[in-house]
Protein backbone atom coordinates (compact mmCIF):
# COMPACT_ATOMS: atom_id res chain seq x y z
CA UNK A 1 0.00 0.00 0.00
CA UNK A 2 1.28 3.43 -0.87
CA UNK A 3 1.01 6.09 1.84
CA UNK A 4 0.82 9.87 1.55
CA UNK A 5 3.67 11.96 2.93
CA UNK A 6 1.45 12.93 5.86
CA UNK A 7 0.71 9.29 6.63
CA UNK A 8 4.41 8.42 6.39
CA UNK A 9 5.26 11.20 8.87
CA UNK A 10 2.58 9.85 11.21
CA UNK A 11 4.02 6.34 10.93
CA UNK A 12 7.54 7.65 11.62
CA UNK A 13 6.21 9.43 14.71
CA UNK A 14 4.69 6.16 15.91
CA UNK A 15 8.01 4.41 15.21
CA UNK A 16 9.76 6.99 17.42
CA UNK A 17 7.13 6.48 20.12
CA UNK A 18 7.72 2.72 19.97
CA UNK A 19 11.48 3.29 20.20
CA UNK A 20 10.94 5.26 23.42
CA UNK A 21 10.12 1.88 24.98
CA UNK A 22 13.69 0.69 24.33
CA UNK A 23 15.60 1.51 27.50
CA UNK A 24 19.39 1.58 27.81
CA UNK A 25 19.83 -0.72 30.83
CA UNK A 26 23.02 1.00 31.98
CA UNK A 27 21.52 4.49 32.03
CA UNK A 28 17.81 3.76 32.50
CA UNK A 29 16.82 6.21 29.75
CA UNK A 30 15.22 5.38 26.42
CA UNK A 31 17.31 5.45 23.26
CA UNK A 32 15.31 8.31 21.70
CA UNK A 33 15.88 10.71 24.61
CA UNK A 34 19.51 9.61 24.80
CA UNK A 35 19.87 10.86 21.23
CA UNK A 36 20.96 7.48 19.87
CA UNK A 37 18.47 7.48 16.97
CA UNK A 38 19.89 9.43 14.04
CA UNK A 39 17.46 8.64 11.21
CA UNK A 40 14.34 6.68 10.35
CA UNK A 41 13.47 5.81 6.76
CA UNK A 42 10.10 4.21 6.05
CA UNK A 43 9.21 2.96 2.56
CA UNK A 44 5.51 3.59 2.11
CA UNK A 45 5.27 1.05 -0.71
CA UNK A 46 6.87 -1.92 1.05
CA UNK A 47 6.82 -1.12 4.77
CA UNK A 48 10.59 -1.60 4.86
CA UNK A 49 12.12 0.51 7.62
CA UNK A 50 15.73 1.49 8.21
CA UNK A 51 16.83 2.92 11.52
CA UNK A 52 20.23 4.58 11.87
CA UNK A 53 21.41 4.59 15.44
CA UNK A 54 24.61 5.00 17.36
CA UNK A 55 25.81 3.97 20.78
CA UNK A 56 27.28 6.04 23.58
CA UNK A 57 30.66 4.35 23.05
CA UNK A 58 32.08 2.29 20.19
CA UNK A 59 32.77 -0.71 22.39
CA UNK A 60 29.33 -0.69 24.02
CA UNK A 61 28.44 -4.28 24.93
CA UNK A 62 24.71 -3.54 24.62
CA UNK A 63 24.54 -3.26 20.83
CA UNK A 64 22.91 -6.66 20.30
CA UNK A 65 20.51 -6.24 23.22
CA UNK A 66 19.34 -2.80 22.06
CA UNK A 67 19.00 -3.99 18.47
CA UNK A 68 16.87 -6.95 19.57
CA UNK A 69 14.70 -4.61 21.63
CA UNK A 70 14.26 -2.34 18.60
CA UNK A 71 13.03 -5.27 16.53
CA UNK A 72 10.59 -6.16 19.31
CA UNK A 73 9.38 -2.55 19.58
CA UNK A 74 8.64 -2.39 15.86
CA UNK A 75 5.96 -5.07 16.26
CA UNK A 76 3.85 -2.27 17.80
CA UNK A 77 3.78 -0.50 14.42
CA UNK A 78 1.79 -2.74 12.06
CA UNK A 79 2.80 -0.81 8.93
CA UNK A 80 6.44 -1.82 9.49
CA UNK A 81 7.00 -5.11 7.66
CA UNK A 82 10.79 -5.37 7.72
CA UNK A 83 13.34 -3.57 9.90
CA UNK A 84 17.05 -3.00 9.39
CA UNK A 85 19.03 -1.37 12.19
CA UNK A 86 22.26 0.25 11.06
CA UNK A 87 24.89 1.21 13.61
CA UNK A 88 26.57 4.45 12.58
CA UNK A 89 29.49 6.21 14.21
CA UNK A 90 29.36 9.58 12.48
CA UNK A 91 28.63 12.00 13.83
CA UNK A 92 29.97 10.73 17.10
CA UNK A 93 27.49 10.69 19.98
CA UNK A 94 27.92 13.39 22.63
CA UNK A 95 25.83 14.37 25.65
CA UNK A 96 24.57 17.35 23.63
CA UNK A 97 22.47 14.89 21.60
CA UNK A 98 20.48 13.97 24.72
CA UNK A 99 17.09 15.56 25.29
CA UNK A 100 16.57 17.97 28.15
CA UNK A 101 14.59 15.22 29.90
CA UNK A 102 17.52 12.77 29.69
CA UNK A 103 20.03 15.34 30.92
CA UNK A 104 17.84 16.22 33.91
CA UNK A 105 17.21 12.54 34.70
CA UNK A 106 20.96 11.86 34.65
CA UNK A 107 21.90 15.06 36.50
CA UNK A 108 23.79 16.55 33.55
CA UNK A 109 23.66 20.31 33.02
Tell what function each PLM region has.
Residues 1-109:
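Domain-level signature for proteins that mediate thiol-based redox and metal-cofactor handling
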